[in-house]
A protein has these predicted regions:
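N-terminal beta1-alpha1 ligand-phosphate binding loop
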Residues: 2-37
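Helix-loop-strand module that forms the ligand-binding subsite of alpha/beta enzymes
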Residues: 62-141
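N-terminal beta-loop-helix "entrance" segment that forms/cooperates
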Residues: 45-62, 158-162
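Glycine-rich phosphate/pyrophosphate-binding loop and the adjoining helix
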Residues: 2-10, 144-203
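Short, glycine/serine-rich, charged loops/turns that create anion-binding
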Residues: 16-17, 47, 122
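A general structural signal for well-ordered alpha-helical segments in protein cores
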Residues: 9, 22, 26, 64, ...
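A generic structural motif
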Residues: 36-41, 143
Length: 203
């Protein structure tokens, strides 16, 4: 039995400022995933302006419900964050914290999902520290960080008119997209094989 639907890839990232480097990086990466055969969903900007996560509060805003609905459906995830003082942005971390609502799911948190990581920052130290932290969070949520991650120097004008200004900006994002889609397809095929009927030879 073979899987027929496209892998569904969710992108989370950016800042409250439209056209930020992390948002543009995420948009380009998702577009590359779509070209690779995926169905995509972008959650960024105002859609990430969620109430501070409180596990004791059961009410969820429409934006939070949309985030959770997409993540539950996702076969792969791409997260793009700026680096603020050596770590990921509070906005992105708060959105990720909402996955606690997925704790009791059959595929809890990010379980069984490939997760691509993108970090934008002005300096190498911030890029490295934030990427390590983001990968650690993905591991804690049972996700599979892709072997390759994209780091972008936001102070070097990496985007022009919303597109990568140079090949060295575009290529890492394309690699992340390719790996997320490829791993998502493999995981989907594995799940299909697990439920496929088995033929047993009779004597």
């Amino acid at each position: 039995m073979t899987q027929t639907r496209k892998p569904f890839i969710v992108g989370i990232g950016g800042t409250q400022r439209p056209g930020s480097s992390s948002e543009l990086a995420l948009r380009y990466c998702l577009a590359a995933a779509e070209k690779a055969g995926a169905e995509i969903d972008l959650i960024c900007g105002a859609e990430l302006e969620l109430p501070l996560f409180d596990p004791g509060v059961t009410h969820r805003t429409p934006a939070a419900l949309r985030l959770l609905q997409s993540l539950r459906r996702a076969d792969g995830i791409i997260i793009a964050t700026p680096s603020y003082h050596g770590g990921m942005s509070g906005t992105i971390k708060n959105a990720i914290d909402y996955t606690e609502d997925m704790r009791g799911d059959v595929r809890s948190y990010f379980d069984g999902r490939a997760v691509g990581c993108i970090v934008c920052a002005a300096g190498d130290q911030a890029l490295g520290a934030t990427l390590i932290g983001l990968r650690s969070i993905v591991h804690a949520l049972r996700g599979w960080p892709t072997p390759y991650a994209a780091t972008i120097k936001s102070n070097e004008k990496p985007f022009v008119d919303g597109k990568p200004a140079r090949r060295e900006v575009a290529q890492p994002l394309e690699i992340v997209a390719s790996q997320v889609v490829s791993f998502a397809e493999m995981a989907m095929a594995s799940r299909v094989d697990d439920v496929a009927p088995r033929l047993v030879a009779s004597n």
